[in-house]
């Protein structure tokens, strides 16, 4: 079996009358991994969107309403749960080998008959920001990438989030001092030379889950390399935007993605 190949798919209750949802089991580096697929009901060829969730395990799990919301903007959306979740095989390792589940998710979208294979975008929220950037670096035919409240520097996350240190040491194999190479491997700002697509950074200035310093470091490095980058910074917002602004940002970011032309 090839990465991105669907093993099993069944209908999942959709919160939107215009979107079909499917629970998917797909192939990723020899593992059966789960995810959620959202497909607009209307016939046509759509842009694809790989939605990369934040958190780990049950924290930050993919929400059907969120996926349907993006699909309603005119995308076929696939959201991997990452290995080891919801009955999937393997174990998450926080942007280590589980990044392959995102890579395979990109291939899954390419195989979908309702997706334009040249118009696949990558969206990451929180920890998903790392996954999105690593996937865009790996998949050089990605049309664009969005990092919303996204982690970009894993060592900075270790420094800032004392509440996550125990988990990070367990899944990564130690602290940044003990295994610096593991943190560097998981930090996309060290690997942006190979990024080809435009980047949109969305971040709240009062974010205490993922500080805006992550966004600043990403922006700085992209500009040093002459990459295309757009920033939408909101000084008074935290990690979670107010509901009305959140909805507006979904629509605006989707429009931004559609406006990007793969050069």
Predicted regions and their residues:
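Conserved alpha/beta-hydrolase "acid-adjacent" motif
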Residues: 208-214
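Alpha/beta-hydrolase fold nucleophile elbow
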Residues: 115-126
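Short beta-strand/loop motif that positions the catalytic acidic residue
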Residues: 195, 201-203, 207
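Hydrolase active-site cap/lid region
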Residues: 133-179
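N-terminal cap/lid segment of alpha/beta-hydrolase-fold proteins
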Residues: 2-42
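C-terminal catalytic histidine-bearing segment of alpha/beta-hydrolase fold enzymes
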Residues: 216, 224-263
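Short substrate-entry loop that stabilizes the transition state in hydrolases
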Residues: 44-46, 51-90, 155
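Alpha/beta-hydrolase active-site loop
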Residues: 93-113
């Amino acid at each position: 079996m090839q990465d991105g190949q669907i093993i099993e798919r069944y209908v999942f209750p959709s919160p939107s009358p215009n979107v079909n949802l499917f629970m998917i089991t797909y192939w990723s580096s020899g593992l059966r991994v789960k995810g959620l697929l959202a497909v607009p009901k209307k016939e046509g060829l759509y842009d694809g969107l790989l939605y990369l969730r934040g958190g780990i395990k049950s924290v930050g799990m993919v929400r059907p309403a969120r996926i349907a919301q993006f699909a309603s903007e005119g995308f076929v959306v696939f959201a991997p749960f990452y290995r080891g979740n919801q009955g999937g095989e393997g174990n998450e390792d926080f942007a280590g080998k589980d990044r392959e589940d995102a890579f395979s998710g990109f291939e899954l979208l390419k195989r979908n008959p309702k997706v334009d294979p040249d118009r696949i975008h990558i969206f990451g929220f929180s920890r998903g920001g790392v996954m999105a950037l690593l996937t865009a670096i790996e998949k050089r035919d990605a049309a664009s990438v969005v990092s919303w409240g996204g982690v970009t520097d894993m060592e900075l996350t270790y420094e800032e989030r004392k509440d996550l240190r125990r988990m990070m040491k367990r899944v990564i194999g130690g602290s940044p001092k003990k295994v610096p190479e593991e943190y560097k491997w998981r930090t996309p700002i060290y690997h942006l030379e190979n990024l080809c697509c435009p980047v949109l950074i969305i971040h709240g200035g009062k974010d205490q889950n993922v500080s805006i310093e992550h966004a600043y470091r990403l922006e700085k490095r992209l500009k040093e390399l002459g990459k295309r980058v757009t920033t939408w910074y909101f000084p008074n917002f935290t990690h979670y935007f107010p509901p009305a602004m959140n909805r507006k940002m979904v629509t605006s970011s989707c429009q931004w993605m559609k406006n990007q032309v793969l050069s």
